[in-house]
Amino acid sequence: MIEDKFMRVLLMFDVPTKSKKEQKLASKFRNNLIKLGYFMLQFSVYMRICKGLSSAKSSIENVKKILPPYGNVRALIITEKQFDKMELLLGGIVFNEKVNNETNLTLFDIDSHGEFKYKNSNNEEIQINKKQEKYHQQNLFEF
């Protein structure tokens, strides 16, 4: 039921950035969030799309391991339906939201031969061209 639904983890944070050391810690925290799969929704609000509640909770546990020593960090888990009800009062949809939406997610499964089978968010299989085309640059100097 709820494990089959896409969930969104919203992280909202305020961390001090007055000294050089605080700026470095804040930057390190943001970079670690990106490494964990979060993307910026707006300043100091990051989001990650997870498949199911347990994955969302696990994602929050991973964030707890990288918290800066000072500041205020909050996490909120919402369903895709709740996220769609969000009202945009001012401004527009940012590039990160367009790229990281539910319809652009690709999931994968492993078949009986150990090969990856890619699926979209509707669990439909996607065909991937496994052959890599080789491109050769022409010689700049002909002798």
Curated annotation (Swiss-Prot):
One of its GO terms (biological process) is defense response to virus. Disulfide bonds: none annotated. Its cofactor is Mg(2+). One of its GO terms (molecular function) is RNA endonuclease activity. CDD domains: Cas2_I_II_III. Mg(2+) binds at D14. NCBIfam families: cas2. CRISPR (clustered regularly interspaced short palindromic repeat), is an adaptive immune system that provides protection against mobile genetic elements (viruses, transposable elements and conjugative plasmids). CRISPR clusters contain sequences complementary to antecedent mobile elements and target invading nucleic acids. CRISPR clusters are transcribed and processed into CRISPR RNA (crRNA). Functions as a ssRNA-specific endoribonuclease. Involved in the integration of spacer DNA into the CRISPR cassette. This is CRISPR-associated endoribonuclease Cas2.
